[in-house]
């Protein structure tokens, strides 16, 4: 699998030419992760570039960094992710901003990011809810950050909470019933 991470369809959409598309088609399977930050980037030119890529059979996903004061509201992210789905780009990752030199004023708390995911989940299509992750320092990989929907167990029941913070119980799987049968 070839993965291309790029911002080209956003900042230089005219680069998506028939010649480039023919070249990309030669190297399959190929997936493209496009870096989007804000719904204002969904210009007609960007939309056309993404549609051309999708029409060429290239699966498209987005990678978005959560940035304080830029895209750290549920409404902004919802507008971005809905706009992406309309142009066949699946919101894939929402990254916690890395602690790099000069980025402190852009960083949010992890709790803020979880608040964003909770504000999306249950209020929009699941396709519009990306994975919220930290790209762990030192080669630790992407670590998902999830709201705590699993609340515990009691009397053979699992206790869960949904996006509205309502609690539900679900019957625990008992090993003697789950092996060899339906």
What do the predicted segments below correspond to?
Residues 1-124:
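Conserved AdoMet/S-adenosylmethionine-binding subsite of the radical SAM
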Residues 85-182:
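Auxiliary Fe-S-binding modules of radical SAM enzymes
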